[in-house]
């Protein structure tokens, strides 16, 4: 009986065991289960199968291709860039993403604009005042526009033009896949990708959760029913809504289940603090996925400015039924709307006249693209169809171990901005300071990472192409489904790859990547280079072809 994990790697392990132990593949039972529970194992034993050689071949193809690319590219890097470097089909593309994002940020020119907000008051017949906060429906690009607008507002009348109420619903996120668990554990718990997988592995091995390397959002009928019972018991029948989710990611294996607790009636477990926190996250996400939508009412109030075409807009949301929000709300990496907030609005009606309390025009700056976190890099790789659940954590770990990428903080720059205020008929301006561009826990390319990326992009553009890497994943899927013969495909790939390798190796007149000729030394007439050496950047006088050995000096 063979009972390794039910994925391509697990199938290959079973095949290797057959080979090593001399077992007959046709007579050896292969069983699979997604959770380590008595019932799951007994069910698996009742339903054995034989080895699936298509899955084995898909894993063999991945292993051979990755070694072929790594074994042929790495020695080139040793000769052309620096010893002890490595390249890989997925890791090099991941580094490319980080390098390109860094260059986007370096090129980015921040553009100022002005966001205008206002505080109004509605005065009741009894003299009580109710405040209303609103934002102008457009932004200004220059300070002159701000001044002109505030001048108009001095004598303007402000009246409620319309009040619109619209019902909204919010639906829960699907159960966890490997990538979404890694992303959410990073956002909510501060775990690294590798840390998340290590803890999840322990939870799986102790029978607490289902298999943690999966790209499926499916839940078994057993889990859906157990979740329904738990929701009705804990929250009431109106909170229950059985849902079936379908995986949208490229090449997903629908036969697998999402990551979920093995027993839905256990919201907490015994274990380490980290195990408890990750388990609770998985339990809440799974339960929420089978709960009713949250029902909200969104109110939008348009406020007319008597002497100009611009309008102020106030928005608010009221939750009429919390539904799944009672248990769980998915986090986001999006910082663009961090300032936006919805609040409960007072009861206003069309025609109500509002008193202006204060109008503020705050200088803002457009934001550069955010650097990748481990979580957002996993999401980007998944969106591009690059890698699989089993490869995300090793890829991110490898590029940091190779020192192509480091995880660190970026200190922002102090920036001055203006706030113009209109109170009564007086316009005043304040200058304030802020730290702009500060980032924590982001993935940053190192000098050697940039050099290696540029060398590979120049000499092996096909290997570094995002579409190529994603297309290879599709080809592995075809092999797993028996649509493609893997050895023939490997031969076809190598026919195109080998000439590229040969051409780069034979380009002897090329300077090493990352090496720059600064001219000649005035004393000796020998060329002066700066380059990346074994232990970092160095200066060099003379070349390896000279009779005398070159002179080196470490650079800071």
Each language-model region and where it sits:
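Phosphate-backbone binding and catalysis cores of DNA-processing enzymes
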Residues: 1-167, 257-320, 476, 480, ...
